[in-house]
Amino acid sequence: MAASVTRVLKGAGGRQLLLMVARRRPVLMQPFLLMPRKFWVSSALRSEDQRQPPFSASSTHAETQGHAEEQYQQKQPPPRYTDQAGEESEGYESEEQLQQQILSAALQFVPDFGWSADAIAEGAKSLDMSAAAAGMFEDGGSELILHFVTQCNLQLTELLEKEQKLVQLGTSEKKPTAQFLRDAVEARLRMHIPYIEHWPQALGMLLLPRNIPSSLKLLTAMVDDIWHYAGDQSTDVSWYTRRAVLTGIYNTTELVMLQDSSPDFEDTWKFLENRISEAMTMGDSVKQVASTGEAVIQGLMGAAVTLKNLTGLNQRR
């Protein structure tokens, strides 16, 4: 059955079909997707046993090297930045912290400047820094988008964890799986609303070859988190099919949202509800798995055409 899934999904390009990357995955993973990235915030909250990697000499060496680098960094003076008056100031523990602050501040300027270095420069100025601080980002627009997606995924994880704790405390009823999935995807997509006019630009940039590994890792981590908090503990082929299906639902709903002019995106949420309902009635037979793969492929092809038409245009009329 796993071979059938692999043959069906192998031929299509796009970020859904590399869904194999996730923290609690079975062993058939693509190793090149596990490379760390500077701005990543882990969105999966697991037990220590689940997080613990297997012991190896290389991991021991990495830990030793990391400890040495940490000691070196502790000896260095704190980074300086230049404010708008041209004076140098200190106030951030690390360059990474400074970059995170600038990117977060830049988000409020995306509606006016798009996902661009200009938005980052305005964000720096809002923190009383020189606009030249935007120069510390090699690919400003892409880094701003990836920062935003990372923060959205983190917010979703915090929301799902809070709901889980309420259920564990007995103060809230456990939702049926279909409702849980629908609410989780809707909550995540609603985070795009303040930036919806510029989201076609964001999707186009996320699909650039240099950004695909990062955007895929964020997407698969988000989907895996949703299934984790939904209570999925499968270890067979259904682990893959469930994540493939939810990824397809998320991406197609995201595209529907870009063209939805109904009040509060009502048509989008109705579309999402219908897709979730259909997915929950699907079994794990070989024929149904194949149908799922074909649907994902068709969704990818449709997404590529739609994005080509949407990118850079004002879609919501």
Curated annotation (Swiss-Prot):
Pfam families: COQ9 (PF08511), COQ9_N (PF21392). It is found in: Mitochondrion. Residues 53-63 have a biased composition (Polar residues). Residues 1-46 form a transit peptide. GO terms for cellular component: mitochondrial inner membrane. One of its GO terms (molecular function) is lipid binding. It comes from the Eukaryota. Residues 85-96 have a biased composition (Acidic residues). Homodimer. Heterodimer; two heterodimers of COQ7:COQ9 come together on the same side of the lipid pseudo-bilayer and form a curved tetramer with a hydrophobic surface suitable for membrane interaction. These two tetramers assemble into a soluble octamer with a pseudo-bilayer of lipids captured within. Interacts with COQ7; this interaction allows ubiquinone (CoQ) isoprene intermediates presentation to COQ7 and facilitates the COQ7-mediated hydroxylase step. This is Ubiquinone biosynthesis protein COQ9-A, mitochondrial. It comes from Xenopus laevis. The lineage of its organism: Eukaryota, Metazoa, Chordata, Craniata, Vertebrata. The gene is coq9-a.
